[in-house]
Design a protein with these regions (language model features):
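Ferredoxin-type iron-sulfur electron-transfer modules and their immediate structural context
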Residues: 1-42, 46, 99-112, 192, ...
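Glycine-rich phosphate/pyrophosphate-binding loops
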Residues: 141-157
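N-terminal secretory signal peptides
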Residues: 164-212
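Extended interfacial segments that mediate partner engagement and assembly in macromolecular machines
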Residues: 75, 83, 87, 92-139
């Protein structure tokens, strides 16, 4: 089975109640010369694997940790349980419950501390910290948290070790983004559950001081601001977030490019940064925003980069007698598809 056929089969098999798959966003599906397997490399449970040149998928092993979705630069994989909006509601609850000092804790850390999730109801509990992406952490600053703590187990010996490696990269990127926008909010990664989120005697899911049970709160909480803010930032980027396109109906646009989209996480990230402050730096080192460097002497103007770019960060330019491309770093996800498919390298 070819890599592309393997990817299509893989994406189809992992779709579940926990995970939504938008195969038209996958850069390896968009162009067979791409070599991205970030979701496979990040999988913490062995549900996705690449061995002996073959892609393997075992859906029953998926724990719904979301690390594959965090690793995917184009949001080809999205979490359904919880969704990003539901996770945001949990984070906002932790901000309120801890009086501005939210805690995100993984299941391994809770197990190591012999603490049930309901006995740490002030924290946001996730299967693995690899679930957290930069927009979620930057959002804590936008919601006026004083600091943020991510509590993990021993990631080196954890069966979900890839998630521990990824969250460290995410934390570093989030710190850099906040610093670039004038925020000094600390983001700490600790191998213990902070005492401030533990309930004396254990509540075992009983209602808190606000009279709302933790699970009922998470089930009913909505994040309406995300939709309004998302529309505003998407309009500023000159694009509207695309609805998933069924493979059978996927078409090339009038200008010869594949369908393009702005993932909700990118829109949410920019909205949060606008609330955090104004840029204080010209450059920032992070895995989620990039800038393409083009050697004009080598470029043959084939514009394949614009044809396959998933977000429109590189677009065709045909106006005023000018023939070429235009690059918008604000939409670049660092998927590196343009780099891999450029015939001139």
């Amino acid at each position: 089975m070819s890599l592309i056929n393997g990817l299509l089969a893989l994406l189809g098999e992992i779709e579940s109640d926990a995970i939504a798959v938008h195969e038209e966003r996958c850069i390896s599906v968009r162009n067979r010369n791409a070599d991205c397997l970030r979701c496979v490399e990040a999988c913490t449970s062995g549900a996705l694997a690449y061995r002996a040149g073959e892609l393997l998928v075992e859906p029953e092993r998926c724990i719904g940790c979301g690390t594959c979705a965090t690793a995917c630069p184009t949001c080809a994989i999205e979490l359904r349980n919880p969704t990003d909006a539901e996770l945001t509601a949990q984070l906002k609850h932790s901000i309120v419950a801890t009086k501005g000092h939210p805690v995100i804790v993984c299941e391994q850390a809770l197990e190591a501390a012999n603490v049930a999730a309901d006995d740490a109801s002030a924290a946001c509990a996730v299967p693995c910290l690899g679930r957290m992406d930069e927009s979620a952490l930057v959002g804590l600053a936008a919601y006026r948290a004083f600091d943020a703590t991510l509590a993990c187990g021993s990631c080196e010996t954890c069966p979900h070790a890839p998630g521990g490696a990824l969250v460290r990269e995410v934390v570093e990127g989030a710190r850099n983004l906040l610093e670039a926008f004038g925020s000094s909010m600390p983001i700490d990664l600790e191998e213990c559950v902070p005492e401030r989120v533990l309930e004396p005697g254990g509540s075992h899911g009983q209602a808190g001081s606000d009279g709302v049970g933790r699970r009922d709160f998470f089930r009913s909480a909505k994040d309406a601001s995300t939709r309004a803010a998302g529309a505003a930032v998407a309009e500023e980027l000159g694009m509207v977030e695309a609805e998933p396109v069924p493979a059978a109906h996927r078409k090339v646009g009038a200008d010869g490019t594949l369908s393009q989209f702005v993932p909700t996480r990118r829109v949410r990230l920019y909205n949060y940064l606008q609330h955090v402050g104004q840029p204080t730096a010209d450059e920032v080192e992070t895995r989620v925003i990039g800038a393409v460097s083009i050697d004009a002497q080598k470029c043959s103007s084939c514009r394949m980069c614009a044809v396959f770019c998933p977000t429109g960060a590189i677009k065709k330019l045909d106006e005023g007698g000018v023939f070429g491309i235009v690059h918008r770093p604000s939409a670049c996800m660092q998927c590196r598809l343009c780099e891999h498919i450029c015939p001139e390298q």
